[in-house]
Amino acid sequence: DLGENIRIGDGKCAIMAGPCSIENEEQVEKTVAFLRAQGVRMMRGGVFKPRSSPYAFRGSGIDGLKMFANSCRKAGIKIITEVMQVEQIDQMYEYVDIFQVGARNALNFNLLDALGKTDKPVLLKRGMSGTIEELLSAAEYVFSNGNEQIILCERGIRTYEKAYRNTLDLNAVPILKEKSHLPVVVDP
């Protein structure tokens, strides 16, 4: 329960939308206005971006997060963004409603332990080649440290196909629901 009648896991469709990365104020303002007009109450966007290439844009950082939070708060939209390091949790805490653990950090056990000691929901994305059991184990790291507000995310896995980045494993969704009481979301 994120407050303001926003819930995940209550059987209703919860839409979380937004850009891959938070780049500038104009982008955020336009996206916030569009999402709000559609009735979407949760916006995701990366301010720290783990990239395959060291030359790619790696995010707008804490300043981008502050701007992102300011725009979303004014519109009553909750914020989801990726945390990549334990040290970032305290910096980000007041601006984030849901901490996201991305695929590249799915097995970062120090980060999972630290997020387990917070009182904010944690969205766990399945690792790039992660198994269902590894995703559930990641959730256990958070859970065993006291935080039961965990959302599992099927985001696709790496396969031999190169036409698209990830292959969505829809079979994982009912299996995760069968093996766990935690809410499951899909990031196509």
Q: Whereabouts are the PLM-identified features?
A:
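Active-site mouth loops of central-metabolism enzymes
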Residues: 13-30, 54-59, 78-82, 102-103, ...
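N-terminal amphipathic alpha-helix/helix-capping segment at the start of soluble metabolic enzymes
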Residues: 1-16
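Alpha-helix-loop-beta-strand connector modules within alpha/beta enzyme cores
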Residues: 57-81, 114-121, 170-185
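Catalytic alpha/beta core domains of metabolic enzymes, predominantly
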Residues: 8, 118-188
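Glycine-rich, proline-tolerant flexible connector loops at the mouths of alpha/beta enzymes
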Residues: 44-63
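Conserved, mostly hydrophobic/aromatic
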Residues: 18, 35, 43, 92, ...
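Catalytic beta/alpha-barrel core
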Residues: 58-60, 76-87, 97-109, 121-132, ...
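Short, well-ordered coil/turn segments that N-cap beta-strands
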Residues: 11-13, 39-41, 73-79, 95-97, ...
